[in-house]
């Protein structure tokens, strides 16, 4: 797909809907200006950087008091960097819920990912502040026993969710399970035990949909997302997840949504994500 995109406009959903050479060839549109537009888009997005420092400081002051954080999706590219920053910039205990057959396997998995990005020995420096729980986010009560679930719900003060299927292609059932069902389970968890805010990582792609080439506008978590014009399975599932959070917010569950753009590599170290071949961000 990457090679084809250098010369042609590629409709990715159509590409995978009927992945035959005849169908792919019939749907390719050659465009001599495609690279020019890509460069124009890159420079346009580079200029869209505006931060409200006062609001940011107040936000950081509020959450500096949080002592127990549940971080989900910590083995992902974004998740591992969130873990790193939480360890560097807070004194909180970070609980990770990881799917594994044993505690040793779970520990080795998170250590492998952490040290891949931050160097040998970096994990051991902070391991005393990392609490690992074996579970499955797609299952009711995260696959925990009732007592384990209640205990977790009674001491976690904030939930950061970066767990997601980001392949942009695959079965609808997979996207629904990982990108929507997990968020429903997180909301159920937030309703149990002490009050806890949800911080959900979404994608900037849902803002544009079929209107991506139109003028940019301000779009926040207070605005209603829509499925109109979104044929991409990944984007549709992320819109549905945001709707779950919006409905929960109307019921008193506090949540914030952070819409990420393409995260490609660490600009300081040059490290790319481990599963670079599975992410369409590199197409």
Residue ranges and their predicted role:
Residues 4, 24, 72, 94, ...:
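Conserved structural-core and active-site-/substrate-pathway-adjacent residues in large, well-folded domains
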Residues 91, 232-240:
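The catalytic Tyr-X3-Lys active-site helix of short-chain dehydrogenase/reductase
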Residues 34-158, 162:
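N-terminal Rossmann/SDR dinucleotide-binding element
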């Amino acid at each position: 797909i990457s090679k084809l995109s250098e010369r042609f406009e590629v409709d990715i959903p159509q590409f995978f809907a009927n992945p035959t050479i005849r169908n792919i060839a019939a749907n390719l549109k050659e465009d001599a200006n495609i690279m020019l537009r890509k460069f124009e888009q890159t420079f346009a997005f580079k200029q869209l950087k505006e931060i409200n420092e006062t609001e940011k400081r107040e936000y950081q002051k509020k959450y500096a008091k949080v002592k127990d954080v549940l971080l989900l999706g910590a083995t992902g590219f974004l998740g591992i960097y969130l873990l790193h920053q939480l360890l560097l910039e807070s004194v909180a205990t970070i609980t990770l819920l990881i799917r594994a057959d044993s505690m040793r396997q779970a520990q080795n998995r998170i250590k492998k990912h952490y040290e891949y990005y931050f160097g040998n020995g970096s994990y051991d420096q902070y391991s005393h502040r990392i609490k690992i729980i074996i579970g499955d986010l797609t299952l009711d009560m995260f696959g925990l026993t009732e007592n384990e679930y209640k205990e977790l719900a009674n001491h976690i003060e904030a939930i950061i969710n970066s767990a997601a299927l980001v392949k942009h292609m695959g079965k609808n059932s997979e996207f629904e399970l990982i990108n929507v069902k997990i968020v429903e389970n997180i909301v159920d968890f937030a309703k149990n035990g002490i009050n806890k805010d949800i911080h959900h990582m979404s994608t900037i792609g849902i803002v544009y949909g079929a209107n991506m080439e139109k003028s940019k506008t301000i779009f926040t978590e207070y605005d209603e997302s829509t499925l109109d014009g979104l044929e991409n399975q990944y984007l549709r599932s992320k819109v549905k997840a945001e709707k779950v959070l919006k409905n929960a917010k109307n019921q008193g569950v506090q949540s914030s949504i952070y819409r990420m753009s393409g995260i490609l590599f660490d600009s300081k170290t040059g490290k790319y994500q481990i599963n670079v071949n599975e992410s369409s961000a590199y197409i």
